[in-house]
């Protein structure tokens, strides 16, 4: 921490933070409680303030009263660190609410390119105040512990003065952002969600200012904080728990499917060409593909297999077993497993313990997520049609039930994929016989990952999230936001590897290898020191798995590109990403450094790269 002089002053609705010679303003008049039918501003409430001074620091506690219900805010500075702490505490506040917006956003209104905001949506986004595109909508409405924020924090830098704001109780918190087209401002702040309808407990945030700062400095502040809190578990530590971690590093990622069956009430159902709603590739065909890839010289490979259960991909979960009968049944799956084992390749199955399908043979509405209004949630979105969400408290039991059956058939699993857990928001359950908070949901999801570890199976999920990192080893991808949009769509900001600057040496991230009209995504895989897909079918493919001449040429090129990425990953997977930046202030020319040893330079205008060792 470089800044040594911080003072907090209150002026009416404003809180002023004097950091050395820099002034940061926060208008508390913008804070409010959102109820179902109205919005109540903090400055409309009866309140009183008191100064607090003790052995830790000093600050101001404000007690608010609304309809004879009281809550308090406490803003204080920790003397030993100069960290600013924000606490929101229910005293006698038992009212149900939708959200509490506190603290307010900082004033950040200069139309300057070097006034930037750092957003942790997916891998990371940088937004200059002058950025040409609007950014006002976040994934999952900004809810922490989802892909809206791989890490529950954000930061802002004006010239070389900056801060990072960290949520310390993220499971019931979210954030919002307002950046209009061409700026001139970016406002970002946190809000508090009810836990089973109520405020329930003290919510905590931490604000850390930094002088002469940059993107890397703020990320390293966060990394230090994560280490202090025990969130930081390296791949080397995970490898001591399961030696397959080292085996996965440098592997070619192969994503393939077996059975597709799209029911009529799914939004993906093709009414014009109904024959396209079903597809089948046998386990034998997939085994032949594995043989073919081995003949191509691939020495390390991980197969992620979709739709291996009899109902087909995204159908009947959690009752997706037995192995797909039409594709060869348990014997066919065992043959595929043996083929992978023969070549020392790794095998993992797609699995799902959130989407709870009405078509499941054991479906029970009493195990489905009950909403606050006591109704059972339902939707018809994915291939299997009408579904609810499974109460997460039951997920560990279903995971154990299903994996015990798979392993009993001597299927050689060294990794597996529990869909959406680290991507989608946390769930609550309002069933009066068994209430579940979001924090408990998070803990139950982690129990599922830990069970896999107990079977020497590496756990993965759709994306990555800090709350899962003690157990999660890898994921389907950990991409930049724009990579999941069409190449010609407007971007929300400049892609930056905020997550990898903190956690690169803690998790394995595969990267898409697409070549669009303007960019080669392989460059991002190199910049981030990740691993590569050698082939990846979509979630709802309609393919036959056959190789033709054109496919052979394409496959040869994909293998060549994979080897470039894998060679680097094997050198840097266990190293911290120690530096990142732009060359000549050009966002299209970026560099990263791993362990102060290896530097990667990419040019997204020329689609070129350079890897420098022993720097």
PLM regions: where:
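Aromatic-lined carbohydrate-binding/catalytic grooves of carbohydrate-active enzymes
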Residues: 246-400, 411-416, 422-434
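Short acidic, gly/pro-rich beta-turn/loop elements at beta-sheet edges
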Residues: 96-98, 110, 313, 357-359, ...
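Residue-level detector of flexible, active-site-proximal loop/helix-junction positions
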Residues: 122, 354, 466
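Short C-terminal domain-edge/linker segments immediately following a structured domain
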Residues: 116-122, 130-133, 333-336, 379-381, ...
């Amino acid at each position: 921490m470089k800044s040594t002089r911080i003072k907090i002053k209150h002026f009416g609705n404003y809180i002023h933070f004097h950091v050395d010679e820099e002034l940061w303003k926060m208008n508390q008049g913008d804070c409010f409680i959102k109820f179902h039918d109205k919005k109540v501003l903090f400055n409309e409430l009866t309140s009183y303030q008191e100064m607090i001074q003790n052995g830790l620091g000093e600050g101001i506690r404000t007690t608010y009263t609304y309809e004879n219900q009281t809550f308090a805010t406490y803003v204080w500075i920790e003397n030993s660190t100069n960290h600013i702490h924000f606490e929101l505490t229910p005293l006698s506040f038992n009212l149900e609410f939708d959200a509490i917006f506190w603290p307010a956003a900082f004033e950040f209104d200069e139309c300057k390119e070097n006034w930037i905001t750092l957003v942790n949506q997916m891998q990371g986004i940088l937004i200059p105040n002058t950025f040409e595109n609007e950014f006002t909508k976040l994934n999952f409405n900004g809810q922490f512990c989802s892909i809206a924020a791989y890490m529950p924090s954000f930061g802002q830098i004006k010239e070389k003065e900056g801060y990072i704001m960290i949520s310390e109780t993220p499971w019931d918190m979210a954030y919002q952002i307002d950046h209009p087209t061409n700026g001139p401002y970016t406002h970002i702040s946190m809000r508090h969600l009810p836990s089973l309808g109520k405020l329930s407990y003290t919510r905590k945030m931490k604000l850390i200012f930094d002088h002469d700062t940059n993107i890397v400095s703020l990320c390293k502040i966060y990394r230090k904080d994560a280490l202090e809190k025990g969130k930081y578990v390296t791949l080397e530590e995970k490898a001591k728990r399961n030696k397959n971690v080292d085996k996965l590093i440098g592997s070619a990622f192969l994503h393939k499917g077996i059975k597709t069956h799209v029911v009529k009430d799914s939004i993906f159902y093709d009414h014009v060409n109904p024959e396209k709603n079903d597809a089948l590739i046998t386990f034998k065909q997939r085994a032949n593909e594995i043989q073919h890839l081995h003949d191509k010289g691939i020495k390390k490979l991980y197969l992620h297999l979709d739709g291996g259960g009899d109902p087909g991909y995204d159908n009947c979960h959690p009752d997706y077993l037995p192995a797909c009968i039409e594709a060869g049944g348990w014997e066919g799956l065992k043959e595929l497993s043996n083929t992978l084992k023969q070549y020392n390749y790794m095998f993992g199955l797609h699995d799902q313990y959130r989407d709870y399908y009405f078509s499941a043979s054991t479906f029970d509405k009493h195990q489905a997520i009950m909403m606050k209004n006591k109704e059972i949630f339902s939707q018809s979105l994915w291939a299997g049609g009408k579904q609810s969400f499974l109460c997460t408290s039951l997920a560990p039991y279903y995971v154990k039930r299903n994996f015990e059956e798979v392993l009993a058939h001597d299927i050689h699993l060294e990794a597996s994929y529990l869909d959406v857990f680290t991507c989608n928001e946390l769930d609550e359950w309002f069933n009066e016989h068994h209430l579940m908070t979001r924090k408990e949901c998070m803990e139950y999801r982690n129990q599922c990952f830990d069970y896999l570890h107990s079977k020497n199976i590496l756990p993965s999920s759709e994306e990555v999230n800090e709350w899962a990192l003690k157990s999660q080893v890898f994921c389907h991808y950990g991409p930049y936001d724009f990579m999941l949009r069409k190449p010609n769509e407007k971007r929300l900001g400049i892609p930056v590897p905020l997550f990898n600057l903190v956690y690169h040496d803690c998790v394995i991230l595969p990267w898409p290898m697409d070549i669009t009209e303007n960019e080669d995504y392989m460059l991002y895989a190199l910049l981030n020191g990740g691993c590569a897909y050698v082939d990846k079918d979509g979630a709802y493919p309609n393919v036959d798995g056959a190789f033709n001449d054109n496919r052979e040429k394409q496959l040869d090129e994909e293998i060549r590109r994979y080897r470039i990425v894998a060679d680097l990953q094997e050198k840097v997977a266990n190293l911290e990403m120690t530096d990142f930046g732009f060359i000549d202030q050009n966002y299209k020319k970026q560099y990263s450094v791993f362990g102060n040893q290896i530097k990667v330079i990419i040019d997204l205008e020329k689609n070129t790269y350079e890897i420098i060792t022993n720097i």
